[in-house]
Protein backbone atom coordinates (compact mmCIF):
# COMPACT_ATOMS: atom_id res chain seq x y z
CA UNK A 1 0.00 0.00 0.00
CA UNK A 2 1.37 3.34 -1.01
CA UNK A 3 0.34 6.96 -0.61
CA UNK A 4 -0.98 8.61 -3.78
CA UNK A 5 1.91 9.36 -6.14
CA UNK A 6 1.49 13.11 -5.80
CA UNK A 7 2.29 12.90 -2.08
CA UNK A 8 5.71 11.27 -2.44
CA UNK A 9 8.35 13.97 -1.94
CA UNK A 10 11.27 14.25 -4.30
CA UNK A 11 14.17 13.35 -2.05
CA UNK A 12 17.39 11.58 -2.94
CA UNK A 13 17.09 7.81 -3.05
CA UNK A 14 18.89 6.53 0.10
CA UNK A 15 20.88 3.78 -1.62
CA UNK A 16 21.92 5.87 -4.62
CA UNK A 17 25.38 7.28 -5.10
CA UNK A 18 24.89 10.95 -5.96
CA UNK A 19 26.82 10.43 -9.21
CA UNK A 20 24.91 7.28 -10.24
CA UNK A 21 22.60 7.54 -13.25
CA UNK A 22 19.37 5.77 -12.29
CA UNK A 23 18.12 5.80 -15.88
CA UNK A 24 20.76 3.29 -16.97
CA UNK A 25 20.17 0.63 -14.29
CA UNK A 26 18.83 -2.05 -16.65
CA UNK A 27 16.62 -2.54 -19.68
CA UNK A 28 13.31 -3.16 -17.93
CA UNK A 29 13.48 -0.50 -15.21
CA UNK A 30 13.34 3.24 -15.67
CA UNK A 31 13.49 5.38 -12.56
CA UNK A 32 11.66 8.65 -13.08
CA UNK A 33 12.51 9.95 -9.63
CA UNK A 34 13.67 8.55 -6.32
CA UNK A 35 13.65 4.76 -6.49
CA UNK A 36 13.76 2.13 -3.80
CA UNK A 37 13.69 -1.52 -4.87
CA UNK A 38 11.87 -3.81 -2.43
CA UNK A 39 11.62 -7.59 -2.63
CA UNK A 40 8.67 -9.14 -0.77
CA UNK A 41 8.32 -12.89 -0.45
CA UNK A 42 6.37 -15.35 1.69
CA UNK A 43 9.20 -17.90 1.96
CA UNK A 44 7.41 -20.62 3.98
CA UNK A 45 10.69 -21.35 5.84
CA UNK A 46 14.12 -19.80 5.63
CA UNK A 47 16.35 -22.71 4.66
CA UNK A 48 19.98 -22.26 3.53
CA UNK A 49 18.94 -23.02 -0.07
CA UNK A 50 16.18 -20.40 0.02
CA UNK A 51 18.52 -17.82 1.55
CA UNK A 52 20.97 -18.47 -1.31
CA UNK A 53 18.24 -18.04 -3.96
CA UNK A 54 16.98 -14.85 -2.28
CA UNK A 55 20.53 -13.47 -2.25
CA UNK A 56 20.96 -14.25 -5.96
CA UNK A 57 17.63 -12.66 -6.92
CA UNK A 58 18.30 -9.60 -4.77
CA UNK A 59 21.75 -9.15 -6.30
CA UNK A 60 20.52 -9.60 -9.88
CA UNK A 61 17.57 -7.22 -9.39
CA UNK A 62 19.57 -4.65 -7.36
CA UNK A 63 17.19 -4.97 -4.40
CA UNK A 64 17.58 -2.46 -1.55
CA UNK A 65 15.13 -3.91 1.00
CA UNK A 66 14.02 -7.52 1.41
CA UNK A 67 10.83 -8.26 3.37
CA UNK A 68 10.18 -11.93 4.15
CA UNK A 69 7.15 -13.54 5.76
CA UNK A 70 6.62 -17.04 7.19
CA UNK A 71 10.31 -17.48 7.98
CA UNK A 72 9.46 -20.37 10.37
CA UNK A 73 12.48 -19.60 12.55
CA UNK A 74 11.84 -20.00 16.28
CA UNK A 75 15.41 -19.88 17.60
CA UNK A 76 17.40 -16.68 17.87
CA UNK A 77 20.33 -18.05 15.86
CA UNK A 78 22.05 -15.49 13.60
CA UNK A 79 23.15 -18.03 10.97
CA UNK A 80 19.52 -18.95 10.26
CA UNK A 81 18.86 -15.38 9.09
CA UNK A 82 22.02 -14.70 7.05
CA UNK A 83 21.46 -13.48 3.48
CA UNK A 84 24.66 -12.61 1.64
CA UNK A 85 24.93 -8.90 0.84
CA UNK A 86 22.23 -7.85 3.32
CA UNK A 87 22.00 -6.71 6.92
CA UNK A 88 19.14 -7.96 9.09
CA UNK A 89 17.32 -4.92 10.51
CA UNK A 90 14.34 -6.55 12.24
CA UNK A 91 12.77 -9.96 12.75
CA UNK A 92 9.99 -11.78 14.57
CA UNK A 93 10.61 -15.33 15.76
CA UNK A 94 7.88 -17.95 15.34
CA UNK A 95 7.90 -21.65 14.46
CA UNK A 96 4.95 -21.36 12.03
CA UNK A 97 4.96 -17.66 11.10
CA UNK A 98 7.71 -15.07 11.55
CA UNK A 99 9.11 -12.12 9.60
CA UNK A 100 12.51 -10.79 8.63
CA UNK A 101 13.45 -7.42 7.12
CA UNK A 102 16.83 -6.77 5.51
CA UNK A 103 18.60 -3.86 3.83
CA UNK A 104 21.41 -4.01 1.31
CA UNK A 105 24.75 -3.96 3.12
CA UNK A 106 25.91 -0.64 1.67
CA UNK A 107 22.85 1.29 2.85
CA UNK A 108 23.84 3.11 6.01
CA UNK A 109 20.66 5.11 6.66
CA UNK A 110 18.55 2.19 7.94
CA UNK A 111 16.96 1.74 11.35
CA UNK A 112 14.28 -0.32 13.06
CA UNK A 113 11.43 2.01 14.07
CA UNK A 114 8.79 -0.16 15.73
CA UNK A 115 7.18 -3.59 15.83
CA UNK A 116 3.57 -4.63 16.36
CA UNK A 117 2.08 -8.13 16.43
CA UNK A 118 1.62 -8.00 12.64
CA UNK A 119 4.41 -5.78 11.32
CA UNK A 120 7.95 -4.50 11.68
CA UNK A 121 8.65 -0.95 10.53
CA UNK A 122 12.04 0.22 9.35
CA UNK A 123 13.19 3.59 8.05
CA UNK A 124 15.57 3.85 5.11
CA UNK A 125 16.50 7.43 4.38
CA UNK A 126 13.19 9.29 4.32
CA UNK A 127 11.11 6.18 3.57
CA UNK A 128 9.22 4.04 6.10
CA UNK A 129 8.67 0.38 5.15
CA UNK A 130 6.32 -1.90 7.11
CA UNK A 131 6.89 -5.63 6.62
CA UNK A 132 3.43 -7.10 7.32
CA UNK A 133 2.39 -10.67 8.08
CA UNK A 134 -0.97 -11.48 9.62
CA UNK A 135 -1.57 -15.20 10.10
CA UNK A 136 -4.89 -16.34 8.58
CA UNK A 137 -6.12 -17.56 11.97
CA UNK A 138 -5.64 -14.18 13.67
CA UNK A 139 -7.75 -11.02 13.36
CA UNK A 140 -6.86 -7.36 12.88
CA UNK A 141 -7.34 -5.13 15.90
CA UNK A 142 -10.42 -3.21 14.78
CA UNK A 143 -9.25 -0.05 16.55
CA UNK A 144 -5.70 -0.12 15.20
CA UNK A 145 -5.24 -2.33 12.12
CA UNK A 146 -1.69 -1.17 11.36
CA UNK A 147 0.38 1.78 12.57
CA UNK A 148 -0.04 5.00 10.64
CA UNK A 149 3.31 6.05 9.19
CA UNK A 150 4.51 9.39 7.82
CA UNK A 151 4.68 9.68 4.05
CA UNK A 152 6.36 8.29 2.09
CA UNK A 153 5.55 4.84 3.44
CA UNK A 154 5.09 1.36 2.03
CA UNK A 155 3.14 -1.44 3.73
CA UNK A 156 4.24 -4.68 2.09
CA UNK A 157 3.71 -8.33 2.88
CA UNK A 158 1.12 -11.07 3.29
CA UNK A 159 -2.02 -9.55 4.79
CA UNK A 160 -4.23 -12.69 4.56
CA UNK A 161 -7.24 -10.43 4.03
CA UNK A 162 -9.68 -10.59 1.13
CA UNK A 163 -11.81 -7.92 -0.51
CA UNK A 164 -13.36 -7.41 -3.99
CA UNK A 165 -11.41 -4.13 -4.34
CA UNK A 166 -8.29 -6.30 -4.54
CA UNK A 167 -9.57 -8.85 -7.07
CA UNK A 168 -11.19 -11.38 -4.74
CA UNK A 169 -14.75 -12.65 -5.26
CA UNK A 170 -15.90 -11.80 -1.73
CA UNK A 171 -14.66 -9.97 1.34
CA UNK A 172 -13.86 -11.51 4.68
CA UNK A 173 -13.97 -9.63 8.00
CA UNK A 174 -10.22 -8.95 7.86
CA UNK A 175 -10.52 -7.67 4.30
CA UNK A 176 -13.31 -5.30 5.26
CA UNK A 177 -11.27 -3.96 8.19
CA UNK A 178 -8.09 -3.55 6.13
CA UNK A 179 -9.92 -1.93 3.22
CA UNK A 180 -11.66 0.50 5.58
CA UNK A 181 -8.35 1.34 7.31
CA UNK A 182 -6.55 1.94 4.00
CA UNK A 183 -9.40 4.07 2.68
CA UNK A 184 -9.58 6.19 5.85
CA UNK A 185 -5.81 6.75 5.68
CA UNK A 186 -5.77 7.61 1.95
CA UNK A 187 -3.61 4.59 1.02
CA UNK A 188 -3.70 2.81 -2.32
CA UNK A 189 -3.18 -0.91 -2.77
CA UNK A 190 -0.76 -2.04 -5.45
CA UNK A 191 -1.06 -5.78 -5.71
CA UNK A 192 -0.60 -8.92 -7.70
CA UNK A 193 -3.35 -11.14 -6.36
CA UNK A 194 -2.34 -14.75 -5.83
CA UNK A 195 -3.68 -16.71 -8.81
Question: What are these model-derived regions, one by one?
Answer:
Residues 1-195:
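A shared catalytic/ligand-binding motif for oxyanion handling
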Amino acid sequence: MLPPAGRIPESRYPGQDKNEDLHGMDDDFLAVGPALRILQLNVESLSPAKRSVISSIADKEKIDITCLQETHVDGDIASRFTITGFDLVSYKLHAKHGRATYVRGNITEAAHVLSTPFCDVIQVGGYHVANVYKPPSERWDSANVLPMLPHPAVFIGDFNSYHPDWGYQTADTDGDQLQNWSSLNDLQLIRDTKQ
